Amino acid sequence: MGITVRKRNGSVEKFEAEKINRVVVWSCEGVNDVSPSDILMKSQIQMYDGVETDAIHDTLIKSAADLISVESPNYQYPAARLLLFKLRKQAYGGFEPRPLYAHILMTVARGKYDEHLISDYTKEEIEFLDTVIDHDRDFDYTYAAMRQYEDKYLVKDRVTGEIFESPQTALMLIAMCLMSKEDPKKRLQKVIDLYNMVSTMKVSLPTPIMGGVRTPTRQFSSCVLIESGDDINQIFAAVEAQGKYAAQRAGIGLNFGAIRGQDAPIRGGEVKHAGTVGIVRMYQESLGWASQGGLRKASANYFYPIWHWDFENLIVMKNNRGTESTRARHVDYGVQINKFFYTRLQKGGKISFFHPNVANGDLYKYFFSDQEAFAELYEKLEADPSIPRKELEATDAFTRLAQERSQTGRIYIQNVDHCNSNSPFLPDVAPIKQSNLCMEIALPTAPINNIKDPKDSGEVALCTLSAINLGKIEKLEDLEEPVMITVRALDNLLDYQNYPVLAAEKTLLRRTLGIGWTNLAYYLAKRGLKYSSPEAANEVHKLAEAFQFYLLKASVQLAKERGACEWYDQTSYSRGILPIDRYKKEVDQLHTAELQQDWESLRLDIALHGLRNSTLSTMMPCETSSQITNSTNGIEPPRGPVTFKKSPAGMLPTLVPGVGEEGVVYEYKWDMNGPTAYLNLMAIIQKFIDQSISTNTFYKPWDYPGGKLPIKIVLRDLMYAYKIGLKTVYYQETRDGEDEEDDGCESGACKL
């Protein structure tokens, strides 16, 4: 008797080698420079009686994936197709997808899809949309992309691992959900437009949308910003808000900077304050149980001002020294600075540390809302011997900051004055007091007093993300259509989703969006431009200008249809101030480009109709979606032609797009002479966009004497970033000789 195999459904049949050959040959059809026989030879399948067909299939997938290299990049596609074959068999029982209407009915009945899909759309509409789905677009994905779909995006039972759909079905359902409340006469076309944008990889959606829209859990904002006040009720309200959002797919930015430091008097001296270290540890521990539906670990970034009384205890909380009781290593930290403190550093002065509630909280308030008033009050408090304060040389304080940043890579910087001067919000009405997990969001917040009170004055800020794939852009005008469709879809999402915390519903009054880019490096490489070239600076200026112009144009169009957002009067746009009016002028020394768009016409349009959205743009990390769209990560220069990214399936080889193609010339991160040229491009982008940028610094230690990065270089670059107007600085990367690329923002939430 011959060898038998056991199929997924438990049945047993005779092993047929020809079936394996046919599948491998099929996976290579139409793909240049790949060999079915090489895949089969590498697989060396170990046959034995009763072997499971899934095991055979997994071996073939691994065999094809192991052949992926810079020399043979196209093995990405047979590996992806073999994995797709497996996923479709799991979802549909065979390779051909189930009819869409029957599939929706079945999956709604299983509790995996939101039932509004069958109440908002008729059977006839769904059957029509089924004819639009192009399942062959699944063949355009690389192996890394298909693994991301399997691991993060496809609706599945996260306990058993059972998959319920394939990529194109998921994308059509996302489009149906986001356009479900559009005018029924125009709705189907809007569904098709969004589906085509996403399925042809012109637009990239974030993990919460990709993994969540179409399911009954309706929370899709990537970034959540929570502010804690100094009152005990506010401290615990922040804990509860953090927990609710961390459990529902969001990354957390939490500002505890208003909380008094150690030994501050409570109730007129009845009690001494225990300090912020224990509170930060409590915040960290409350993240631990938030599973986020199996999609990612809960992650957070905690903010405080450099002049906080507890600075010396807080700045070391990320490092591996000290005891557990004095550390909270599983979160990141954002240190808030302004020009006043950089000037103290430059002039060799001192930094005085105060409790944030000093002067009835005015010092803390002015730190964000009024820079002149802050400097005046700070110096007045320094001169008053009755005010408790501690003191360090500015060089000592900044050196400690730079050392911790270098050792951990994850002590971030928020330049709060830039966040409020180059802002779409009026700082005296809606100041920016923190950022988010990945440092690209800058939105107003306010402490919550009672999380269950609908009249509470607290505000949790939310931002909903997306990115335009610049690899698909040939000319600047190509930006307009994907931008228009994306702004509409994300604005719809704000009304479509639920708000687990009442204070977050103020998002509906601001309607904040954060649309950015992915694949900038490929965009430049196709044009033969290096990050460090003057030509790249001018090209990025034109690109960023057109991008923001089209975003504002799209939001004006929505305002004409639906009205301006309710809190439009809190924006600088309502005062006639555009991005071209409020940026830091030093950036214009970095390029020679002239403005190309008709800003005065747009200014008039905004004055007449307002904007639907308080914010529209940001530049986020794109580690995950860059794999889906086969693009370079966001606005970052790639580390090399191939990197390996962690996934549940192991290390995924990821190649930059166009590698080896004639005329495609990349400038890789580790070939650059430090981060200066990259920082210049980021500053040019920051000139136009509403919020901030996940801007990194990066170093090769062996470029410096003794193979050690000098702290003065770290400080030089932080001060340079400030000088050219950057609002935030994210990771410090240090080359360790490996080509592994971690998934950056651990939660995956506020990145794409």
Q: What kind of region is each of these model predictions?
A:
Residues V155, E162, T169-R187, V191, ...:
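Function-dense linear segments that define catalytic or interfacial modules
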Residues V34-L40, D54-A55, V70-P78, K185-D193, ...:
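Flexible, glycine/charged-enriched surface loops at secondary-structure junctions
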Residues S11, V34-M172, M176, Q189-Y195:
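Core nucleic-acid recognition elements
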Residues V271-R281, G288-F398, Q403, N492, ...:
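Conserved catalytic alpha/beta cores of large enzymes that bind or transform nucleotide phosphates
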Residues M197, V483-A504, L529-C622, S694:
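Internal maturation/activation junctions in enzymes
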Residues L117, E125-Y149, C438-N449, L490, ...:
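Catalytic alpha/beta core of large soluble enzyme barrels
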Residues K42-S43, I61-S63, A79-F85, M197, ...:
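A glycine-rich phosphate-binding loop feature that marks nucleotide/adenosyl-phosphate handling sites
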Residues Y75-G111, R147, I337, C419-I451, ...:
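Terminal amphipathic helices with adjacent charged low-complexity linkers/tails
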